């Protein structure tokens, strides 16, 4: 996280900001605050109940390819950069999203930062990614499954 944050912050231009949400990891939040205390364009946030608002305000979201964050990002149509996965399901999630144009990734932290900054500055790529997210998501799937189950049970 520290290296990726450094790579991103070193590429910020005037007016651009980075928000780093650390959740319950107080040690990481503290060390990031120390690392970036002189940079007014970097905001380190610990646990917050306002992740949805931060996500809605984001031009690009960097996140590991877990199911919840990734699904929320595509539901909100947020351009997405998937960072290093935890081996297993997250590796498959990242491959699924990238192969369908719903996210980008990189082989190392510098490439992740470069790809995310390029995405933030490329309106056409953002539109294409949002279109891919819309085409590959099914926000009403839960409701459809519920109706199908109700129909099957009533027969």
Language model: regions and residue ranges:
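Conserved donor-nucleotide binding/catalytic region of nucleotide-linked donor-dependent transferases
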Residues: 104, 109-110, 117-134, 151, ...
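Donor-nucleotide binding loops and adjacent catalytic segments primarily
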Residues: 1-57
């Amino acid at each position: 996280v520290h290296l990726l944050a450094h790579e991103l912050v070193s590429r910020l231009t005037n007016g651009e900001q980075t928000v780093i949400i650390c959740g319950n990891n107080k040690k990481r939040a503290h060390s990031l605050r120390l690392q970036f205390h002189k940079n007014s364009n970097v905001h380190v946030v610990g646990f917050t109940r306002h992740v949805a608002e931060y996500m809605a305000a984001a031009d690009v979201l960097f996140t590991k390819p877990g199911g919840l964050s990734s699904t929320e990002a595509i539901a909100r149509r947020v351009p997405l950069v998937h960072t290093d996965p935890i081996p297993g399901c997250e590796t498959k999630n990242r491959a699924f999203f990238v192969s369908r144009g719903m996210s980008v990734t990189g082989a190392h932290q510098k490439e992740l930062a470069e790809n995310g900054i390029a995405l933030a500055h490329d309106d056409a790529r953002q539109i294409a990614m949002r279109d891919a997210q819309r085409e590959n998501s099914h926000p009403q799937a839960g409701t459809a499954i519920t109706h199908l189950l109700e129909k099957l049970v009533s027969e």
